[in-house]
Amino acid sequence: MSSCNGNCSECGSDCADRKPESLLAELNPNASVKKVIAVVSGKGGVGKSTVTSMLAVAMARKGKRVGVLDADITGPSAPTAFGVTECQGADEHGLYPALTRTGIQVMSINLLLDNPADPVVWRGPVIAGAVKQFWTDVIWEDVDYLFVDMPPGTGDVPLTVFQSLPVDGVIIVTSPQDLVSMIVAKAVKMANMMHIPVLGFVENYSYLRCPDCGRKISVFGKSHLDEIAAQFDLPILARLPIDPAVAEAYDNGQMETVNTEALSAAVEAIEKTDV
């Protein structure tokens, strides 16, 4: 039997000294990203992309260089939120992301389509591969915080992101509905399985504030987030209201104009990943 040369990638033997291979993909050598924050939800329709864009804006207002990687390949919306329509171009070094009015870097599959309304009809592994290429092929320029807008659920893309990108923390977006509690638990458990810290919850559509008396109206019923937060010993970082102004800003590509003060605790939790 030949002696071991220490290179497990070239050996098929299942010995006790075998080292587990890292699945982390290499960042484009011309790119620089300090921290990666994944924004996830257990189900669709809870406003995860809205929260992602607000977090990016809030962090940019603190003087940080920010990027948004739109990993929702079949339902991309980051270009709409920021009013960008095309990348800065590409060369032999890689692909340059779009730049928003305030300098937020954005990469999305919709920036690469001839017609943004065309559907992306790909199977799971191809979609996951495209997301990985947004890490390996895109030249993220001196990004302090890269926010990854994940597709809902716990399928191929979240698994690829958690395995391939050096995710520093996860923000879980929820809404106040019974079914969501069970689905949110799945998202927490997946992050735990991948050994990625969950920074906390952001409850979107938490309430509607009456324009006449200022009373908070629970449009979607009683929230159960306190119970699940206690179950997993995780903080609730924000409760965001139903705000037609935010929805209008999102649809018009004006998210950089919205008030993000309600996310100050979430921003603080993200900044603590630097410690």
Predicted regions and their residues:
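Walker A/P-loop phosphate-binding motif and the immediately C-terminal alpha-helix
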Residues: 35-73, 188
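C-terminal lobe/tail of nucleotide-utilizing enzymes
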Residues: 1-21, 188-275
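Conserved Switch II/interswitch segment of TRAFAC-class P-loop GTPases
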Residues: 141-148, 154-155, 166-187
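Phosphate-binding P-loop
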Residues: 28-34
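Phosphate-binding/switch loop-helix module in NTP-utilizing enzymes
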Residues: 113-161
